[in-house]
């Protein structure tokens, strides 16, 4: 069986304000297979988000390699990244457009990584689908399709972030706290 994620000897070193090096990830290796649920535990500043950023291909490692579906994640185009992985951030404001409505944010998530265009026409075409999906999740979002997300509660924003991350049914879902 081929691993969905292959993390080999990942090292991430950063420099602080005094030009001193700090090791954030130290020789981390991990294979994740289809249907695996992996929990990464650690205190604040332990490197969990750094690890997720590396897996997502948004933060280069100092050394080591990360492969998703057999391909080096650093070579992924935005389209390929959107196809294979999705993410929910610690802060539910990240990855969303606060002044846009719930429905508009869901539309962006649905077509993330694809060519832009036809936004208003697509929104009306998908509103019923989003309504049905939201009703399954609950958390009061079904009443807020036309509400800018800056007016949602923290829990509703987090539920929206999770819904946005799962819309494309990615191979890999990264949940950061």
Regions found by a protein language model. Give the residues of each.
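ABC ATPase NBD coupling module
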Residues: 18, 60, 72-86, 94, ...
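The feature captures the beta-strand-to-loop junction immediately N-terminal to the Walker
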Residues: 41-43
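Helix-to-loop junction immediately C-terminal to a conserved catalytic motif
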Residues: 56
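Q-loop/switch helix immediately C-terminal to the Walker
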Residues: 99-115
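Conserved ABC nucleotide-binding domain
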Residues: 133-151
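A short, proline-enriched helix->beta-strand linker immediately N-terminal to the Walker B motif
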Residues: 165-171, 177
